[in-house]
Each structure stands twice: as C-alpha cells, then as structure tokens.
Amino acid sequence: MNFGKAILKATRRGEHTRIWEYSQAPLQWLGSPGEPPVYYLRNPNGGLLGGDRHRIEIGLGPGSALEIRTQGAMRLHPGLIRQQVKVKLAPTSQLIWIPHPTIPGAGADFRQQVQIELDPTARLAYAEIWTAGRLAMDERWQFEHLANCLQVWVTAGIPSSPEGRKLWLQEHIDLHFPHRQVSAASVLGSHLCWGSLYLLGDWPEPTWLTVHISGTESPYWLVKSPDPICKGWILRQVGPQAEAIWRHFGQVALQLAQAKGGSPQGW
C-alpha cells in the first residue's frame, strides 16, 4: 500500500521557465533542461499496486509551457487502486501530456478521477490509452473493475456562470467483469486497445495521420467542439496495439506544438 504524491508547478519569468516540484514515493519527477522543460513522471514499482492511493497535481502559470512524459506503460496489479489527477492551466500556457498506455491486469480494480481547468487561451494535449489486459501473456478482459471519470472546466469568459467557470466536457468509463458489453461488436468488437487524444484550447486545426498496423488500418473518429469559447478536438482510436495508438497521438501533439512555434523534443 502506497500513498504517492507528485506536484509540479511551472511559472514563466522572461525567457525562462521556473519549476517547483514535490514528490512522495513511489511517484518521482525527473526533469531535463530546455525550453519548454520536459519532465518524466516515474514509478519504480513497475505499476500501481493494490491499496495504492496516488495524487498528481500540475499547474501552469500564464505563458508557461511544459511537457510531461512517462517511461513505460502503467500496469495495474490486483486489488483496489485509486488515483486523483488535477491539472490547472492559466492563460496562454501549454501542456503536452501523452502518457503510455494503461494495462489493467487480472483482478485489478482501478478508480481514477481526472479534473482539468483551463483558460480558453491555454492549450492542452492530453491522452488516455487503455488495453484489455496483459495481451503479451494472452490475458484479455480479466480485470475486475475500471472506472475513469474525466472532467474539463473552462475557467474564464463565462459571464453566465456564478463560479466563473463551466463544465465543458465530462466522460465516464465504468467497466465491470466479465466485460461482455464493451467487447460486443457494437462497442469495441475484436479491438483490444482504445484511446482518446484531447486537444483542448487554442490549437491550430490538426492533420490526422492514417495508422496501419500489420497492414490493417486502425479505425479512428474525430469530434470537434462546437463551443465558441473553448475550441478543441477529440480523436478516438482503436486497434490491436496500444503502443501504435500512443505513438500516433504523440506525433500529432508534436506536430501541433511545432506549428505553434515550440521546439519540443522528438517523439
């Protein structure tokens, strides 16, 4: 049982970004110099264990930019695991966070809440990628429970809201063993991996790449925000390999960051 914590805040001072970070084992931050800064979120335990409760908080000040990466897939071990993620983006800030896929193993009960607040002039590229289990071990749909709640709040330019913000997007995954509904032909069918790329805020319109895996096109769907206050696109993709979806999402995010004049490290 672990109570991990990872907090990171970025502020812009002239031409440089200042970083304040705090971590509590087993979560760790590992940063590298450059503009924008790149920080890795690490967990040396090789995954999340039953009984773990983790909290991740990321805040970007006005005009700051940051990229967060992971070192490998997040494996979920048997037992109840809870994780809470909070992200807050100030005006004209930019965060790119495309984590590796999440792999729920047999008996895992994973419950995650992700809350994002952003100014309409900020930019966020964030992804969630999931698999049906430890596919390399021929394990499919053996996890006990997978619950993931994502909320996105727009925090400025909302005169009709007494709180000065409005709920812009809410999505909820709630999968229970034996997972007959999600594996039905009308949902995922034979696909064992799925993911969503959220491009929120002031991004240029992206160019989507067609991905082929073992000679077969990996299906995807695009949703564009009709909201005049906060622009955005959501890319949904399914396929047999989560790594291919992750690389595709990373390439799209890199392309957009370069179009905005940034110089992020290659994917």
From Swiss-Prot:
GO molecular function: nickel cation binding
UniProt entry tagged with the keyword Zinc-finger: no
GO cellular-component term (any): cytoplasm
Residues in the signal sequence: none
Keyword field: Chaperone, Cytoplasm, Nickel insertion
Pfam families named among the record's database cross-references: UreD
Major subcellular location class: cytoplasm
Recorded superkingdom: Bacteria
InterPro entries in the record: UreD
Subcellular location: Cytoplasm
Sequence similarity: Belongs to the UreD family.
Its biological purpose: Required for maturation of urease via the functional incorporation of the urease nickel metallocenter.
PANTHER family registered for this protein in UniProt: UREASE ACCESSORY PROTEIN D (PTHR33643:SF1)
Subunit structure: UreD, UreF and UreG form a complex that acts as a GTP-hydrolysis-dependent molecular chaperone, activating the urease apoprotein by helping to assemble the nickel containing metallocenter of UreC. The UreE protein probably delivers the nickel.
Protein name as it appears in the record: Urease accessory protein UreD
